[in-house]
Amino acid sequence: MSLSAIDTKKIILKYGKSEQNSGITEVQVVLLTNQINYLQIHFSQHKKDHCSRRGLLNMVSKRRKLLDYLKKKNISRYSALIEDLHLRR
């Protein structure tokens, strides 16, 4: 949606430690965060797009669950990711 394939690969390499490792929690959170940021810009222009707003809420919920899982499993990786993405928590 908002990222090209090259940008996605760069994110996977940075947070997944290899090009194949796209399932790691940090990678999923970063990709969701980028999609959420793109949709926030979209909603500044299209205020009545309620179908996409529902998708945004689902993405925010999924990111919240992934962050809770990461916090429960490894607090140091969670803290580093929150600081790197500049998320409020």
UniProtKB/Swiss-Prot annotation:
Q: Which Pfam families match?
A: Ribosomal_S15 (PF00312)
Q: Which SMART domains match?
A: Ribosomal_S15
Q: Which CDD domains match?
A: Ribosomal_S15p_S13e (cd00353)
Q: Which domain of life is it from?
A: Bacteria
> What Gene3D superfamilies does its record include?
6.10.250.3130, S15/NS1, RNA-binding
Q: Which PANTHER family match?
A: RIBOSOMAL PROTEIN S15, BACTERIAL AND ORGANELLAR, SMALL RIBOSOMAL SUBUNIT PROTEIN US15M
Give the protein's biological function. Answer: One of the primary rRNA binding proteins, it binds directly to 16S rRNA where it helps nucleate assembly of the platform of the 30S subunit by binding and bridging several RNA helices of the 16S rRNA. Forms an intersubunit bridge (bridge B4) with the 23S rRNA of the 50S subunit in the ribosome.
> What is this protein called in UniProt?
Small ribosomal subunit protein uS15
Q: Which organism is it from?
A: Buchnera aphidicola subsp. Acyrthosiphon pisum (strain APS) (Acyrthosiphon pisum symbiotic bacterium)
